[in-house]
Amino acid sequence: MVNQMRSAIVKVFSTKHSLTLPAPALHYIEEVLIENEIPEDEWMVGLEFWAKEYLKAEDSSSLVSLQALKKAYENLQLGTTEDTQVADPSEVNVESHFSVVDSFDMPAMRYDPVRSGFVQSKAQPSVAGQASSRSAFLRERWAIIKEIILRNENFTPPAIGGHDRANYLKLTSIRNLLGRAGQLFLLFGMLARNEEGKLCLEDGESRVVLDMEDAVPGEGLFTEGCMVLIEGEYTVEETVRVLAMGHPPSERRNIARSLHGHVDFLGGGAVSLKEEQKYNPTVLANTQISFVILSDVWLDHPRTMPALRQMFEGYANTAEYRPMVFVLCGNFCQGGWEGQEGLKRYSRGFNSLAELLQSIPLLHSSHFVFVPGPSDPWSSTTLPRPSLPSAFTTRLSNRIPNARFVSNPCRLKYFGMEIVICREDLMGKMMRNLVVVKEGEEMNMKRYLVQTILDQAHLSPLPISVRPTLWEYDHALRLYPMPSAVVLADKYERYELTYEGCHVFNPGKFVGGIGEDGWEFEWSMYYPATGRSERSVLTME
C-alpha cells in the first residue's frame, strides 16, 4: 500500500506538475494521507488539490520545501485558499492584526547574493559583535542596493538585437579601471576616506581616490558611508575625475514585496501580497483608526503634564475616533537624567504619567509605545538602542497593561503595513558630515534627507565613526523592503512628505514654545487608511 501511495504522490507532484519532492516532504504527504485515513480512490483528487494549492503560493519553487507544503495543507484545511474572496471588514478583528516590533526581536535576515534572496542567520546576533561582522554588514548593504540597481529598467539589458542595447547603463567594478585612463565609467560603491584622508570610492573589491573639483551632485545629501553612483573619467594618476554623483534608484514597496513577500522580516509570520490584498478593504474601511506620534515629550517640563492631560482627555471623549496607539518618543527629560537629582526627576516624570493615564479609563483600550531618545538613560551611543530601563518604567507598566517600552528604532505592523519609528537627530548629523550637496534656489533639505534615507534603504547611512551601530543588528536599521511609512522624529522642524509611495514625517517637538495665543504643543496623527499624516496643535495659556 505504501508503494502505491508513493507512486500516486510522484505521479501528481513530479510527473504532472514537474515538482521535486525531497524525502521530508514526501514522508509528510504520506503521513497526512495515512493519519486522515484517505481512501485510495480519493488519493489522486486530494493530491491534485494539494499540488495546485502549493503552486499558488508566491514562495513556491520546483524544489518543494516542507514549510511551504505544510502551509498549503493548512490553507486547504481552513478553506483559506488564494481564491478566497476579500475579508468582510465588519467581521475582522483589527486588534489581532496590530503588533509592535522591537529591533532586538526581529529575525536576523541576511542577504545572500548568490541566491539573490534573504535567509535567516543561524547564529544569534550579539550586541558585542564579532570582528568579521564589522565588514560583513557593509558588504551586505552594498549587495542589496546593487541588486536593486541591476533590477532598475535603466540598467536592464534590452533583448538581444534590440535597438537600445548599446545605450543601457553598465556598471564597472573599480578593479577593472586599471590601464583604461581617459575613458568614462559608471561606478557604484561607498564613499569613504583612505589612510591619507582623501575621499575615495569602495566597492568591496577595491577602492579609488575621487577628484571632486568638477563634480555635479544630484538631489540628496552625500556623506561618507553613503552608497553612490558616480560617472567619471579614470585618469593617469589612477584617480577618478567625478563628473556626476547620484544616489542609487529606490525600489517601491510593492515591487520588493513581490520578490520577497514570503520572507518574514519582522517576525510573527510573513504576510503575502495576496493576503495583504485580501485585507485591503478592511484597512480602507477603518478610516477612524489613527496612530498618534509625539516626540521630545519632556516629562520634567512644567507645562507638559497639563498639555498631555488635555490632549488625552480630548481623545478619550471622542469614542469613535479614539486613537489605536499613542507613540511617545524621547527625550523624556529636558534637564537630563545624570546625577541623583536627575534620576529622581526622571522617575517622578514617569510616575506622574502613570497616574495621568490611569485616571483616564477610556484610553485603556489604546496601546502606548515608548521609544527612547538620544539623551535618555542610559544614553547609549549606538543604534539600535535598547528600551528604557525598567527601574523607571515598572510602575507605569504595572498600571497600564497596553504599555510597551521598546527599542529605538521600532516598528508597527498593521495588517500588511509597516511603520518605522526612529528617534534620531538625523538632519543635524547629515548636515555636519556632508561631502557635497546640490545647491540652488530649489534646494529642499527636508526632501533631500527623505530621499537619501529611502534611496540608501537605511536609517543611518553614516560611517560608524560618526554614528556607531550594532553591526549584527544592522538588519533592524534596514529600510528594505521600503516601509509603508517612516517617522523620523527629530529636533529639526516638523515636515511631512511622500517619496516613492512611502510617507515620511517628523512630528516635531511636543513642547513647541510660546505662540501668539499662548504655549503651543504639536504632534502628528497618522491614518493607515489613507497612508498620510496631519499636524495636530494644542494651544494653552
UniProtKB/Swiss-Prot annotation:
GO cellular component: chromatin; epsilon DNA polymerase complex
A GO MF label: DNA binding
Keywords on record: DNA replication, DNA-binding, Nucleus
Localization, UniProt: Nucleus
GO BP term (any one): error-prone translesion synthesis
InterPro entries listed in its UniProt record: DNA_pol_a/d/e_bsu, POLE2
Pfam family, one: DNA_pol_E_B
PANTHER family per record: DNA POLYMERASE EPSILON SUBUNIT 2, DNA POLYMERASE EPSILON SUBUNIT B
Family: Belongs to the DNA polymerase epsilon subunit B family.
Other noteworthy facts: In eukaryotes there are five DNA polymerases: alpha, beta, gamma, delta, and epsilon which are responsible for different reactions of DNA synthesis.
Function comment: As accessory component of the DNA polymerase epsilon (DNA polymerase II) participates in chromosomal DNA replication.
Description of how the protein assembles with itself and partners: Heterotetramer. Consists of four subunits: POL2, DPB2, DPB3 and DPB4.
Protein name: DNA polymerase epsilon subunit B
Native source species: Cryptococcus neoformans var. neoformans serotype D (strain JEC21 / ATCC MYA-565) (Filobasidiella neoformans)
Gene: DPB2
